[in-house]
């Protein structure tokens, strides 16, 4: 049976509904069900001038491989009157309901992977609902130890810390955290991506990886001891390496993944290499979850002036993870 993917439609005022509609024009060798408001999707399709046939389904319905012009929809109702580019805190509950329903449906085995469209964190918080992001919200439902990894143009970058102020990163790099993150990264590269013994390059925290302790001591006190212990367990780990040279081609050619210590250490390089096709992947969950690596682009909602490459790649990677074998790019 082809993989069964569930796609959330994201913030209704943003480009999430547009992405779902535009995705309907492409064939995919998997079943794709969109979780969202059918009226919203039909309205956005008319605005974009995209002919579309919506077929309503219930959770767990087997849908055929994705065919152009057809969108299978698992209905969830939003507040009426949503307009492209116009945020409304009243829709926060709808947005979170689609994510929660999607996570639960995958956890129940109705779908093989969850693919998420972008949401607007600020408007959810304005509605009085504390929300830091998809990753933490989904993990609160499914359990697990989430690790953020992005992939683009043939290489993968995972993060030891995610959305932290730079002043707090050093304190967050602990033996416990680093051991846990590397364990999740190694396990999911084996379990989800089919590597028998993944090769992981590990960044240092400080310039020049600490320069032997002259530019910071975290490499000596935390990173090196963790790597030494995990190598004894059979992991193929190289580092800590200076981030300014780690990302050179001759290093990446011998790596299956890179672990960066903080957000802006690793992600700018990856996004430069392939921003329009970068994919956000959450490791360490009992379900598969991929996402686009861009925001809601409120100014482009309803215009048709958007790039679907990141969503198409998120679908491809979800298929790859669900089947354990490479999926061709759409």
Swiss-Prot record:
Residues engaged in binding a divalent metal cation: 163, 208, 263
GO cellular component: cytoplasm
Keywords: Cobalt, Cytoplasm, Magnesium, Metal-binding, NAD, NADP, Oxidoreductase, Pyridoxine biosynthesis, Zinc
Cofactor annotation comment: Binds 1 divalent metal cation per subunit. Can use ions such as Zn(2+), Mg(2+) or Co(2+).
Compartments in which it is found: Cytoplasm
Family: Belongs to the PdxA family.
Annotated HAMAP family: PdxA (MF_00536)
The protein's name: 4-hydroxythreonine-4-phosphate dehydrogenase
Gene: pdxA
